[in-house]
C-alpha cells in the first residue's frame, strides 16, 4: 500500500451526527447513499438508531477508580479495550486504500477489525498491512 497524506477531522466534528455530516460532504451522493443505508426496508437500521436513543449514562463522581481498566482478552489476545471495527463492504468506494486504511487506523487505536466477506481487499493483503 502506498502512503498518502493523512487527513484530520475538522474542529467541531465530535458526535455521530457531526461525523455523518462531514462524511456526506466528502463522498459522492451514490456512495453516501450506500454507506448510510440499510438492507431491504431498513427495519434493523431504524431499530438500532432507536436503541441507541434509549441509552443514558449515569455519571458517578467522587468514586475510587484506581486499578480500573478497559482491557479484555479476546481470541487469546489482550486488547486495550473491547472495541472492534464492524465489517463494512466495499470500502474502496470511500477510500483508495480501502480495508487496509481502516486496518491501520484500527491498529493505531488498539482496536480490532472484522473484515467483511464483501471486502474490496483480500484478507491476506489486509493482514500484511498490520502484521
Which residue ranges define each predicted feature?
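Active-site mouth loops of central-metabolism enzymes
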Residues: 84-96
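Alpha-helical segments flanking ligand/cofactor-binding loops in enzyme cores
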Residues: 100-104, 124
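An N-cap/entry alpha-helix motif that binds or orients negatively charged groups
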Residues: 2-79
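Hydrophobic faces of well-ordered beta-strands that scaffold small-molecule active sites
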Residues: 83-86, 111-115
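Active-site-adjacent beta->alpha loops and helix N-cap segments on the catalytic face
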Residues: 94-96, 115-130
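Short, surface-exposed connector motifs at secondary-structure boundaries
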Residues: 105-111, 129-131
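Short glycine-rich, polar/acidic loop-and-turn segments at beta strand-coil junctions
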Residues: 39, 87-89, 117-119
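Conserved, mostly hydrophobic/aromatic
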Residues: 27-28, 85, 106
